[in-house]
Amino acid sequence: MLDLKRIRTDFDTVAAKLKNRGVSEDTLTHLKELDEKRRTLLVQSEELKAERNIASAAIAQAKRQKEDATQQIADMQKVSADIKTIDNQLVAIDQQVADIITVLPNTPHDSVPVGADEEDNVEIRRWGTPRDFDFEVKAHWDLGEDLDILDWERGAKVTGARFLFYKNLGARLERALYNFMLDEHIKEGYQEIITPYMVNHDSMFGTGQYPKFKEDTFELADTNFVLIPTAEVPLTNYYRGEILDGKELPIYFTAMSPSFRSEAGSAGRDTRGLIRLHQFHKVEMVKFAKSEESYQELEKMTANAENILQKLGLPYRVISLCTGDMGFSAAKTYDLEVWIPAQNTYREISSCSNTEDFQARRAQIRYRDEADGKVKLLHTLNGSGLAVGRTVAAILENYQNEDGSVTIPEVLRPYMGGETVISPK
């Protein structure tokens, strides 16, 4: 959530930055007007309360002296009624302010490219060279069926579209991947966490999914619970409402969890395969850092995600998302896109973002600075390290062989009991 004081004191800068994120200046102008009206009413309310205190003292004095206080009582009742009217106005204005400010996206960092959509994203670097196949490549969904490791038909029967069963060496490959990813992140200083897979609405608000993106989630009927769309939500909210010791920062968390997404608005996109599912595993990274360290920590986090792809030998590229393509809470985002041979293109496999103090303000996560003793909002960062199903897809396609088998990447073999290849039955 943005700082209302910043909007008030640096309106033009904030308006220009949010314009690049699709927010009209009229919206901010209305917010500023509401804020000014609210501040005026607060002054009036305080003045009236002072009048009421004076009147109350005068009434008490008159009663002690057994004088008629009828007029003073009438005056005080009128002042009290005026205060109640103003308080009701303030409640209404506070709600209007909340309705606006809670759905305003974060302001982009100055280094973020300005653009409307993914066409305006900027490639930063590439790693690896896509393999030159001398046979016709298969899509990962066909490989999965031929190898009897992915069962789409029964997934659809048991649950519905965009669900599947992993089986045999497919299940072992999925498990090997997330164990490998977790081990790599632990080496980099991340604390492993097993989170709840349901969170409450306050947690969804804290990380920015609520109230704006409710349609993208699965809520449990007649409860305050939501199935997590990513482990970012419980990990970030771990410290919600707390004040941390500045000496402890930065703090690194990692977790593997299922992610549940309704994929609202994705009808017709990626209807086959592992790219877009309602339920998938993902290894998440979350950091809590001081403001002066957070962008260095973003570079480190991105490197941690890249490390996984490099050790798996999967070609990828790093993209800096433009203002029009970033997520709601992000101030800056790098996407990692892995090479998918059957589609002859790169597809997103990780997003690493610095939200600065946007989530921390919503969730009230603060720290006490050891230098000056002041309590300050910290910065939160999050990143995929990696989306496991999409990594399975990338391995199946990039490591496929002409005979229909798939070679298992060397780093995963110790996690799969020494297996070296997945062969057709």
Swiss-Prot record:
Cellular compartments annotated: Cytoplasm
Domain of life: Bacteria
Main location: cytoplasm
InterPro entries from the UniProt entry: aa-tRNA-synt_IIb, aa-tRNA-synth_II, aa-tRNA-synth_II/BPL/LPL, Ser-tRNA-ligase_type_1, Ser-tRNA-synth_1_N, SerRS_1_N_sf, SerRS_core, tRNA-bd_arm
Membrane-spanning residues: none
EC number(s) on file: 6.1.1.11
CDD domains: SerRS_core
Domain commentary: Consists of two distinct domains, a catalytic core and a N-terminal extension that is involved in tRNA binding.
Subunit text: Homodimer. The tRNA molecule binds across the dimer.
Name of the protein this chain belongs to: Serine--tRNA ligase
Lineage summary: Bacteria, Bacillati, Bacillota, Bacilli, Lactobacillales
